[in-house]
Amino acid sequence: MRVNETNQEDVRNWIKLRLARNLDTFGAIRLLKVFGSAESVLEGSLSDLARTVGMPAAEGVVAVARGAADDDVDAALERLLSNQESGILTIADPLYPAGLIESGLAPLLLFTRGNESLLRREATTICGSASADEEGLRNAEFFGKAISEAGMTVLVPSEPGIPSAAVSGALSAHQGVPPAVLLASGTARAPREMTGLLKALLAAGGLLISAELPEASQSDASKILRDGLLAGFSRRLLVVEAERHAPILDIARRAAELGSLVGAIPGGIHNPLARGANALIREGAM
């Protein structure tokens, strides 16, 4: 959803809820069901709010309603209004990924930059080592291109190596679907090493997605959140190359628990970059 003069106050209220201390997504949803809108939630009394979500979360809502986070809210809203590529999806938006909601991992808001209509398509997540070898990079490019040409969105985390190679493959596809990248930073602060690739992605009609405010920097906490979202974002996840104890293995296992189809590309038994993918195959990955 693009932000304009008509909807900016509603968006402002949603961002305030997102920034309320001690209020998680489930609590926000309960409040929205009881009060009917983000505006009404922010107008609620402390006692009424506390009856629904408890006192700590209620105090967080009252604080943002009184302006506690206005600087951050204003900065986010200014970015959304000034950049025509930028948008926002509330958890109530029809374009909000259903897989995230069903997984129980959904943040209240997703910030976007680029072509939001890609979220209507089926997606396949491709992930793997940031320090991949040549074979791994070739495989990632191959599958990125093939999946794009099959009419699906290639979704990757904002990392070098396998994810970047998969994006390059999708961008090289003949009449393919542009790829999407899930960021650990805000959409206005993409990783420097990926600047050129992400510019090409946006120019080709791709999409950047983040659970962080547009100007937010990447942090350990935001990477953990981003990795959790990867597990629930799509119904298919492919691990191209990963070390034995790589974090992506936990993401793949979580995706399998959520009902996603998980695949892994096997590699040589002496290749340390293949041991993680080989382990997933032994556990039942396709």
Predicted regions and their residues:
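Glycine-biased, small-residue-rich flexible motifs in mid-sequence functional cores and linkers
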Residues: 1-10, 91-286
